[in-house]
Amino acid sequence: MFSEITIRHATDHDVTAVRHLAALDEADAPQGDALLAFVDGELVAARSKEGQAVADPFRRTRHVLELLDLQSRQEQAA
């Protein structure tokens, strides 16, 4: 079975969800412009332009964090 992964930029409407994710990860929420990763519609990871990332510690997210890193590098190169 395949999961749908969606990556998009955070908006003001995502603040609460990102803070909740950071609390789960026991880390500070990424500041400024951030990329978010959703698996099957559920937020599982967030990454700032500076590289600060948080992820759901109860899910396998390494591949999602790698996708966020790749997307961020591509945007910075453009």
Where are these regions (language model features)?
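Charged, low-complexity, helix-prone segments enriched in Lys/Glu/Asp/Gln
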Residues: 25-30, 38, 71-72, 77
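Short acidic, gly/pro-rich beta-turn/loop elements at beta-sheet edges
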Residues: 17-20, 47, 51
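Acyl-donor binding region in acyl/amide transferases
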Residues: 49-78
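Conserved beta-hairpin
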Residues: 33-45
